Every structure is written in C-alpha cells, then in structure tokens.
Amino acid sequence: MQGRILAVALLLASPLYAFDRQDFDRIADFSVTIKTLAGLSEAGGLSGRLLLLDGTVASMQFLDAAEASFAVELELAGGEWIGTEDVKIYLCRVRFRGQEYFRRFPRRAPRAPGPSEILLNDRILVVARLAGRAVAEDGSPLWVLEGLHVRALR
C-alpha cells in the first residue's frame, strides 16, 4: 500500500521537474527594487508578475478595520545615500486585503510584538504585483501594489 502511495505521489510531482528558470522568470521578477519602480513610467513587462521588495513601513493607513473585510495600505520606503550628505527616498504603496492580514497589522502597537506582526518603521519583505498608480502628497506619481505575502525582517 505504501508503495502505491509513493508511486502516486511521484507521478503527481513529476510535472514540477518540467519548470525551469525561464518559466519562473515569466511569473516573477526579483530584480526590481523600490528605486527601479520609482523610475518606471509604465508597467511594461512587470504587469501581472510577482515582485519581491524589501523596505521600511513609512506609514500605515487602515482602509477597512473590520476583520471580515480588512484592508490596509502601507507606504513602503527605500533609500540610498548620494555622497555623504544627501539621502534619496523612494516610495511605493502596498495594499493588503482580507481577514488573513487582520492580525498581521495591529492598529495599536503591542508592547511585545509577535514575530508575524507588522508595525510602523518595521523593515519588511513583500511579495506583490502591480495594481496601478497613485499620486503622492507632493504630486509625484507613485506605484500601488497588491500585497500577497509579507514578513518582518527582525
């Protein structure tokens, strides 16, 4: 009986060996950063692809605080030094929707945050896809992404 189960498992897993790097690169792009996003005027080849971004949670706006329809929008910031005195900041927004994120983004910062909780000023890693454009407070264009997975880098 165990031999049959193993044989079925191997048959079901065999299509996974057919995937190669080119197949993966068609659905994901891990080379994109917040800086490269800020420089894009159009989605181009990134439309529909998964992006892996890291940055700091600069702001958190709760669009819907009810658990059943929870929605939060993060402003994700990255930056770089220009010389020794200037810093250039790059921003994008990431929206997370669904009750699975309700406990990940507490409205009030706990004294001892759990490992899965995301707080303001946390450095995070996000898997997301482009959802559109918005305008920042200073009038500059800003990419908005649909967040799929998030993890704190502590």
Where are these regions (language model features)?
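Sec-dependent signal peptide recognition
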Residues: Q2-V8
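Hydrophobic h-region of N-terminal signal peptides that target proteins for export
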Residues: A9-A18
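OB-fold and OB-like single-stranded nucleic-acid-recognition modules
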Residues: Y17-R154
